[in-house]
Amino acid sequence: MKDTIAIYHDDNLRYPKDPFDAASIIRNGIDYILSELTGERIDSEWNPLGKLVSKGSKIIIKPNFVTIKDHHFELNSDRQLAVTTNNSLIVPLIEYAYKAVGDNGKIIIADSPIEASDFDKTVSKLGVLHIVEEFQKRGYPVELVDLRDFRVKPIQIINNLRLGNRSFNLGLFIKKSLPGDNSGYSTIDLLEKSAFNNHKGINKLRFYKPHYKKPLEAHFDNHHKYNLANSILEADLIINLPKMKTHKISGVTLALKNLIGLTNKKYWLPHYTEGYMSSGDQYDHEPKMSERIQNFLRVIPIGFGNSIFIRYPITIEESQQVQMPIYNGSWIKNDTLWRTILDVAKVVEYSDKTGNLAETKQRKVLSIIDGVVAGEGNGPLGATAKYCDVLLGSMNMYHLDFLATKMMGFNTHKIKYLKDIQERDINYTCNQSKLPGFKFVTPERWAGLYEK
């Protein structure tokens, strides 16, 4: 396939009510992107993925199924559209995958969402379970897999009790084992090839979500370990379907960040470095005692992977009127998560089928970003819908993320994992005469994304 980016923009681009609608404009957009990348004309015999895989190959389709619920509130329909990949992108890609791999191939729709996410409820609500069942009835070799071997189930005891301008929440995080990947898991150690190599804060790396474990067991001395499902390592092609949205820790979440959803053992993934300013990036100031207490109460371990959480943030309505405090590295000077993003991309692309790091890429990654309804503001889960009517695709995730970030109206060099990419090296084609551009609302504490 060509080393370019294909962009499809149409003011009428909308998700169809029926994801199987063969005449949908979403399908037209997917076809345009694949035609531009392959250099092939579309006809009845067209097999756009046939240049990437052969009969009997294994394809992973990786959407963003992050969650349908953020602890104590359900995501409303607009917010859901803004944070998860729409199922109408998945249907034509399953059809093209089947045409390429045939009856003896394997197509797996897979994700490893945030630890608290209920995968079964999510894929059911998003309509993906119905899609998979329909294709299975047709004889397609397609599966739906939660790549995690455990989840942390939130149990609300007190849910959103309003105390003045605060929302009081009390509950438990209960660790529950999951079937995981039938092929098992492998641990890959990047050693000196990690972006954390010689990082001065190696002993203070922390993971920011429900599980209380620290990533020190995976990041120490010159060791930097990541855990992948073997189904990923066995894949010949990964079709990466990220959402176009902002992220309060990494600035944006696009093709590269979406690969984090292929990893197991989330608590091995450093999100921030404990401390403030010169000693870390968790806070932008020396935290007050009240802030330290509030952060401590967020997750209190009680053994066996279980924990208590006590949270009393200001209400959502109030948070829109005031600037929220920084915690867990959610600001523009985070110097940690971008390294994790680069490490995971390296592991996904360069690990061979046995879990050893190779010198050359071991599988292809085709990325198509869903920007039909994008997410702006306090993403990933707090993003609000922004209707951009655009799809972008490429075999080069780094260039794709660079151009998507530029289209969002941000300074690409403020996104640390893109800082070495030069715009002059990027080629793109668009169905419109002009590259579409937008101005996304940044996450809080990321206003500097606009600076030149």
Question: Which residues does each predicted region cover?
Answer:
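Extended, low-polarity segments enriched in aliphatic/aromatic residues
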Residues: M1-K452
